[in-house]
Amino acid sequence: MNHLSPAAASEHSSYATSSSHIAASPAPSHQSSATSFSSSSPSPSAKMNASASSDSADFEPPAKPITCRWDDCGKIFYDPEVVYKHLCDDHVGRKSTNNLCLTCKWEGCDVSCAKRDHITSHIRVHTPLKPHNCDACGKTFKRPQDLKKHERIHTEQHQQQRQQKAAQNAAARAYSMSEHATAFGGAYPYPPQLHAANAYLGYPQLPTQHGLYPSASTYPSAYPSLPPTSDYHYAHSTPSASLSPMSSRIDTPQGSSPAPNHHQHQHPHHHAQDAASYIHLASGLDPRSKVTTDPTSYTYLAHGATTSQNLAGSKRGHEQVEHFFGDLRRKKMAPAYDSHMAERLTQTFGMGGIDDVSLNAILSAFDPSATYSQTPSNPSVKPDSASATRPALKQEPTDLAQLNSFLLQLGASAASFGSSLSSASSSASSSFSSQGNNADFDLSSLSQYGLNNIPGFDESLLATHNTNAAGRAIAQLPSRAHSHFPDALLSHQVHQPAYDSVRFSRGAAVVPQLAPMDAGGHSYRRVEALTRAAPDERVARPDVHRVSVKSEHADDDDAMEEDELEDDGSRVSSRFRSISPAASSESGWSEAGAGAGAGGRCGSSSSSPSHGLYPRVSPTEASRRLPPIRSNSSTASSSASISSPIDSDRRATQRRNSDSLDGPLSRHSAPAASPSSPSMSETSLASTNSLYPSLVDRVSQMQGLGRSSDEANAEALRRKHVQLIRDLLIAINFPDRARAKLRADHDRVRLPPILSSVARRRTEEGEVTPSAADELVSASCSDASTDRNSTPTPPGRPTLPTLSQLLNDLPGRPSRPMDEREMECDV
């Protein structure tokens, strides 16, 4: 005691005195407590109990002495708080007192720290100081953060996680035992059951106790998930076998595996009727119907890709969906639709949208009990036990609002993504497609599904994307990019001025002006009147050039030049001949003019070109396919009126060619593009381009339908993703509606019936009468025959059967006024 400081010695002496007083005289305290309680309690037993409780409360055994082992200190303390204070003040010190020591000099410890807080926290490991107590279990901790971390194990969520993890491990052990016994052919028998007396299907009875492998009931703590025998059937009816890597086999239903023998002979009355098949493992199925996972069944083919995705294992689908929503919560993804987001959506949910597996994964991420409270719409798909036992993510109202706002922004971005792509190609397609694309995910379409009342909905989320995709108006003030000012002024003015802005700009003034005609991608073309067709430059220009050359090199031969000009004039004037029925009477002038010479010149000069409604067609262009004309009673007359001037043109051209070949100028008078030549006629017959664009081509160009296959596939994928995002919003906010929709889709999926070649008839009162479908088919066939009679098919070209002939069981589509038919002219 000589080495103690005065303060420590006084502390020690006071502590020893108090302890000796407590140890030497326990009776007075007992007497006082007994006296105090005797006045209030009437019974002697109450006196004894009260005195005993007061003794246990007041009496404390002396603490174990603590020796300070910092260098050669050697001081002895009996209170951990005093030891800790001694180490911090005397040995560690402070910077203000100029005695700070950041190296622990406790016996056998040389830890160096950077700050005083670090070393004072480290000193606690050398003292039995644990002032922080847990109110639940009474454990003590040195630091408050340790106590806070420990208190988490007493929460309800942590207990659920522990129970779920224990159940999952037990299910994995049970499955490994069953697989092990199946692989070795029963060499290691299962633990005996209480129902072993009832042998089933000739299986031998197992002994009550095996020497090497005791029963599971002997060690109940080793198998916490195995319930008592009365609940054994319930334990094995749970989808615990879906942890099997063989659960994706095609020959067994999803999430199930063949039941071992001990399952059957334990409860024979449960499996007596259908124990020899796998169908009893799928609840709610008729034993006579085939499972949808059978690849040879008709139902499997009807479901297509959805069932094949489910066969790949629902566990991976659960993980992908959970990873998607986990990244969404952690804000690892931006609400912008691009190629990466499209690929992520396709990998997570597939091309079929939300199916049973995806819906269960979405709902299990928020509330596992809501996922399996009802039977799934697809009975062949069993819920995964791993997902069923997976802890639910804590879903707060703010989290749901953020999730909905993210999906709303993503859907609006996907809806405007197609319009932004199509606007780069053409203005007409952008105007039509932007309206259609934004209509897929606008306020009106979302309000039809009740999505305008979900948490986090804001109309501005949809308006931002739509306004960005709209582009700049024609009469809007031009931005700096469209003005003629230098780029140095861009830093002075960031925001684009509006018409109602009265502030002075810091840079040069922006002059309001109209945008150029091609600012929005609009293309303008001049449309000529339909009274006459434009002259063909391929025929007219070479003739003029040839005349000029002839006039330069043959000035002495005026008669030949006049004859050649007469032939050229007759050829050019024949292009401006009307083919209307009213002008068909004028078609005889060319024949007379070609045969009579001077009389032909007079006839050609006197006859002026007609200004009828129909355009004038040259013989070269007449060989092409003309726009179709409505098939009615006037079809034959119209085709006759069209063919008559064409034949007269051909005969006149042949006469001119034969006459010019006899003359000395045969090399000039033979036209290069004469329709009488076989090569040109074959080329003209093979040409399928019409003179004017059809209505379908123009409408498809305006709506963006005439695009490449890649753009069409991207557009189809984008539309599927817009629908997928809308379905996700419905599934998250209205799970019951999503289940009902999946169940309805599952019941609605059917393949079309196989058509037979025998036409159906109705039998009424012994006589056979044609049905309405047959009347429509016969009417359509008669229309088709009328069209073929009115437009003869050239020889050598096969005639294809009509659609109503191929599908004789389906009613033919009635013809509409705007239907186009190709009219072929026999030239």
UniProtKB/Swiss-Prot annotation:
A zinc finger (C2H2-type) spans 66-91, 102-126, 132-154. GO terms for biological process: positive regulation of transcription by RNA polymerase II. Residues 554-567 have a biased composition (Acidic residues). The keyword Magnesium does not apply. Keywords: Activator, Cytoplasm, DNA-binding, Metal-binding, Nucleus, Repeat, Repressor, Transcription, Transcription regulation, Zinc, Zinc-finger. Residues 370-380, 779-790 have a biased composition (Polar residues). GO terms for cellular component: cytoplasm; nucleus. Residues 1-60, 153-174, 233-275, 370-392, 535-688, 761-827 are annotated as: Disordered. Disulfide bonds: none annotated. Coiled coil: none annotated. It is found in: Cytoplasm; Nucleus. Activated by C-terminal proteolytic cleavage by signaling protease at neutral to alkaline ambient pH. It holds the Pfam family zf-C2H2. Residues 7-54, 160-174, 237-248, 578-593, 603-612, 628-646, 664-687 have a biased composition (Low complexity). The keyword Transcription applies. GO terms for molecular function: DNA binding; zinc ion binding. Transmembrane segments: none annotated. Residues 535-553, 647-659 have a biased composition (Basic and acidic residues). Belongs to the pacC/RIM101 family. Transcription factor that mediates regulation of both acid- and alkaline-expressed genes in response to ambient pH. At alkaline ambient pH, activates transcription of alkaline-expressed genes (including pacC itself) and represses transcription of acid-expressed genes. Not required for the pH-induced dimorphic transition. PANTHER family: PH-RESPONSE TRANSCRIPTION FACTOR PACC/RIM101 (PTHR47257), PH-RESPONSE TRANSCRIPTION FACTOR PACC_RIM101 (PTHR47257:SF1). This is pH-response transcription factor pacC/RIM101.
